[in-house]
């Protein structure tokens, strides 16, 4: 581990909770942003089905010569 000397500066009893807490806070912020900025995620999480996207139209057959 090339970053092992960090524990000579910061005690693991302080550093690990800070690291894990910051990861949890970032994950919460990302999930909150997704829920606030999309309309379908909240509906999906509440059990509503999402309408399927329409299939693209088939390409036209080439004309015979």
Curated annotation (Swiss-Prot):
GO biological process, one term: photosynthesis, light reaction
Key words of the record: Antenna complex, Bacteriochlorophyll, Cell inner membrane, Cell membrane, Chlorophyll, Chromophore, Light-harvesting polypeptide, Magnesium, Membrane, Metal-binding, Transmembrane, Transmembrane helix
Residues that, per the record, bind a bacteriochlorophyll: 31
Domain of life: Bacteria
Periplasmic-facing ranges: 36-65
Membrane topology according to the record: Single-pass type II membrane protein
Any single Pfam family the record assigns to this protein: LHC
Residue stretches spanning the membrane: 12-35
Lipoprotein recorded as keyword: no
Subcellular locations according to the entry: Cell inner membrane
Spans within the Cytoplasmic topological domain: 1-11
GO molecular function, one term: bacteriochlorophyll binding
CC terms in the record's Gene Ontology section: organelle inner membrane; plasma membrane; plasma membrane light-harvesting complex
Subunit structure: The core complex is formed by different alpha and beta chains, binding bacteriochlorophyll molecules, and arranged most probably in tetrameric structures disposed around the reaction center. The non-pigmented gamma chains may constitute additional components.
Similarity comment text for this entry: Belongs to the antenna complex alpha subunit family.
Role noted for this protein: Antenna complexes are light-harvesting systems, which transfer the excitation energy to the reaction centers.
Protein name: Light-harvesting protein B-800-850 alpha chain C
Organism lineage: Bacteria, Pseudomonadati, Pseudomonadota, Alphaproteobacteria, Hyphomicrobiales
């Amino acid at each position: 581990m090339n970053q092992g000397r960090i524990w000579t500066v910061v005690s693991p009893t302080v550093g690990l909770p800070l690291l894990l807490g910051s990861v949890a806070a970032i994950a919460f912020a990302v999930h909150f942003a997704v829920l606030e900025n999309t309309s379908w995620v909240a509906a999906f999480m509440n059990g509503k089905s999402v309408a399927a996207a329409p299939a693209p139209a088939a390409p036209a057959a080439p004309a015979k010569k």
